[in-house]
Amino acid sequence: MVSPEAVPYAKTGGLADVAGALPLELAKLGHDVRLIIPRYRCIDEPLHMFRRVTDVPVPTDDGPIRAVVEQEQAPSLSIKLTGRVSAFAIRHDPFFGRAGLYQEEGRDYPDNLERFSFFCRGVLALLARFDSAEQWKPDILHLHDWQTALCAVYLKTLYAKQREFAGLKTVLTLHNVGYQGQFPKAQFEKTGLPATLFTPDGLEFYGSVNLLKGGILFADLLTTVSPTYSREILTPEYGFGLEG
C-alpha cells in the first residue's frame, strides 16, 4: 500500500482516512500488508517512533541519492490488534522535512514533481531491497492518487525487465480526479522517463506533464472510492479532462 498520506501519521484530506483504514481491513482478511508513506516532519515522533532500518539508492536527475527507510517501532493500537501490517516511511528531509505535505500558505511546492518522483522510485528501491533480502515480495502494489502514480509508470518502463518486480501488479485508486499532478513540460526530465513518453499517448496533457494520466494509462487496474464516483468521473463535469 503506497500513499502520500495516511491516518494516523499525516493527513490533509479523506485520502488519509482510506489509506489508514484499508490496510487494517485487508489484514483482517488475512493479507500481509506493508504501508509506505513519505517521512514528513509532521509525523508525531514520540507517538509513532519511526526508526531507520536501511538506506536505499534512489536514481534522480542529478545522480543517485540515498534515502533513509524508517519503520514504525511503536505501532498504533489498531495495528497491534489487527497485526500483519507494518508501516514504513521514505525519508529525505530536503523533500519531505517541510511544514506542509504538498504546499505552504496555499501555494504548492514548485518541486512537487521531483519530490514524488523521488518517493515513487524510493518505494521501488525498497521493494527491491525486500526481495534481495528474501524478506517479503508483494503480489500487488496498491497506489493512491497522482503522488504515487509514477510507480505504475516506472514498473512498465524503466523497471520492466527487473526480476524483482516480475509478476507484480498495480492498482491505482482515484480519490479526487480534480487533483492530477500537472507540471510544466520543462520538469518532465525530473521523472527520469524517456522523452518518448511525453506524448498524447503518454504523460503529455495539453502541453503539460500529467502524472495521474500516466498512472491511469499504466496501472493494471483502476478503482475509485465508490461506484457513483466511478460513473461521475466519466463526465466532463467531474472528469476534469480525463473523462475521455
What are these regions (language model features)?
Residues 1-244:
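Catalytic cores of nucleotide-sugar-dependent glycosyltransferases that transfer UDP/GDP/TDP-activated
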